[in-house]
């Protein structure tokens, strides 16, 4: 009898939780920063302030165009001790991918990116000598994370976290939602996507690609 009662209580709790979840509204938070973003979630109230706080934290960590950001301070050698665990996690991921690809992926290659005009500046004439001079301070093996400290072999080395940053902000907001017990959400930021549960029609989230062809 005791076992039956426990099963009944568990089933009732599940049904009550499901009913509460179904009765909650879906909210949308969208806009454009350096890239468009779109966030949809089911909860008992909007979380605009909390989401904005995570976006602000994201930009404070990784925005290379903001001179006050953590990554900018590291690049200027004004900061070496990184207290934020999200930044350290992204750095460790970047090092793992760099090692796995034997350097084909490298978050220290920003000076070479700039050389071809894809970053902050563009060089009018590019020579092999110029490339070689820049390669002296490019390479993932030339920077390490020791505890909380970023250690560079060459002070001219700079980091560009943009290739992992958009996925990271999706994870940051997903973590916010998970801590609040949100079961249904979709987070899209610059083409990086995290989903959980179902949409407002009671279906699994469906993702589409505008131009599903190579080089689109």
Language-model features: where?
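Short, linear, compositionally biased motifs with a strong N-terminal bias
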Residues: 10-11
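Mature catalytic core of soluble alpha/beta enzymes
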Residues: 4-7, 17-216
């Amino acid at each position: 009898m005791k076992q039956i009662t426990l099963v009944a209580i568990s089933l009732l709790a599940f049904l009550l939780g499901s009913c509460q979840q179904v009765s909650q509204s879906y909210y949308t938070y969208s806009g454009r920063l350096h890239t468009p973003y779109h966030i949809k979630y089911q909860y008992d109230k909007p979380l605009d302030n909390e989401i904005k706080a995570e976006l602000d934290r994201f930009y404070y960590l990784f925005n290379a165009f903001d001179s006050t950001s953590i990554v900018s301070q590291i690049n200027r050698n004004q900061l070496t001790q990184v207290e934020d665990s999200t930044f350290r996690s992204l750095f460790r991921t970047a090092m793992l991918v760099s090692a796995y690809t034997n350097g084909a992926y490298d978050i220290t290659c920003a000076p070479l990116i700039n050389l071809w005009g894809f970053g902050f500046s563009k060089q009018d004439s590019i020579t092999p000598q110029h490339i070689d001079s820049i390669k002296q301070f490019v390479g993932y093996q030339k920077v390490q994370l020791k505890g909380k400290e970023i250690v560079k072999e060459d002070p001219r080395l700079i980091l560009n976290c943009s290739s992992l940053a958009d996925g990271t902000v999706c994870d940051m907001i997903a973590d916010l939602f998970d801590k609040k017990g949100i079961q249904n959400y979709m987070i899209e930021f610059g083409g990086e996507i995290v989903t959980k549960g179902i949409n407002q029609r009671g279906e699994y989230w469906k993702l589409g690609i505008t131009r599903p062809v190579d080089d689109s």
